Amino acid sequence: MVNTSDFKEIIENAWCDIANISTNTSITGVIDEIMDLLDQGKVRVSEKINGQWIVNEWIKKAILLSFRIYDMKFVYTNCHDSIIGNFSWFDKIPLKFGQWNADNFKQAKIRVVPGAIVRKSAYIAPGAVLMPSFVNVGAYVGEGTMVDTWASVGSCAQVGKNCHISGGAGIGGVLEPLTASPVIIEDNCFIGARSEIVEGVIVEEGAVVSMGVYIGASTKIIDRTSGEVFFGRVPAYSVVVPGSYSSGNVSIYCAIIVKKVDQNTRNKVSINELLRDNYAATSI
C-alpha cells in the first residue's frame, strides 16, 4: 500500500467544506489519483489489520466527492461487431476497461467476457474471471476469483481470492453511512446462485453459502448443531443453507449452518458433496 497521509488530509478538509466542493477545482486532481490507486488495488476501502476489518472512511469520502465534482458524460462506443453492435451510456464514472487494449488485459492477467461491466476504481486481481456481471465503484475482487453470470459486486464490497460468486448472486455495496462496513467475502468462499449478502455482512474464510440464501445484518444465522446464533457474520468454514425457525404461530426465515468443515476437507470435497445431504433439516 502507498503512503496516503497527504491525500487523507486533503480529502478530510474538502469533506468539511463539501458545500463549496463544486467550485474547488484543486481537489479534482487528488480525487483522480485516489480513484486510480483504487483501480490499481494500491489502496482499499476496507482492509484486514491485525485480524480485524477496518474501513478507510476517507476513501469512501473521496468516492462520494467524485460524484460531486465529476460531470455527466455521454459515451458512445462503436464496437464494429455484428453481434454486440453499438452502445452508449451517460454517467459520471468511466468504465474501467474503456481505454484498454489487448496488452492491458494481458498485463492484468484477467479474463473478461462480453457483457461484464466494471466501473473505474474497482480492482480486479490477476487470475480473476468476469462473466457477464457488474462490479461497482471501489470494489475489490481478489486473485483467481470468478464472478459468474448476472452476479453483482456492489460499491466498496471486498471479495477475497479464489472465491466463486455464482450466477445471479448479489454482493451488496455501501457508500453511506461512512462508518458502515462493506460486505466482505474472505478468501476461498463459495456464494451460491441467486444468494444475497448485504448490509456489511462478513463471510469468513472457506465458508460455503448455498443457493438462494439471503443474509443481512439482522438475519439470524443459526448453528444447527450447537444452537449458537450469529448476526452479521458467517463463521469460517461453515456450510450454510436457507431455513426457518418457529416463533409463536409463524415460521421466520433464517440461514442455517448445517455443518462445519476444516480446510483440508474444504479443499478435497466438492461443493455439491458438502451441500447434497443437508436440505432435509432446514427448519428449527
From Swiss-Prot:
GO molecular function per UniProt: 2,3,4,5-tetrahydropyridine-2,6-dicarboxylate N-succinyltransferase activity
Class of enzymatic activity (EC top level): transferase
Domain of life: Bacteria
Key words, A-Z: Acyltransferase, Amino-acid biosynthesis, Cytoplasm, Diaminopimelate biosynthesis, Lysine biosynthesis, Repeat, Transferase
Binding site for substrate: 111, 148
InterPro entries for this protein: DapD_Trfase_Hexpep_rpt_fam, Hexapep, THP_succinylTrfase_dom1, THP_succinylTrfase_N_sf, Trans_hexapeptide_repeat, Trimer_LpxA-like_sf
UniProt name for this protein: 2,3,4,5-tetrahydropyridine-2,6-dicarboxylate N-succinyltransferase
Organism the protein comes from: Ehrlichia ruminantium (strain Gardel)
Gene designation per UniProt: dapD
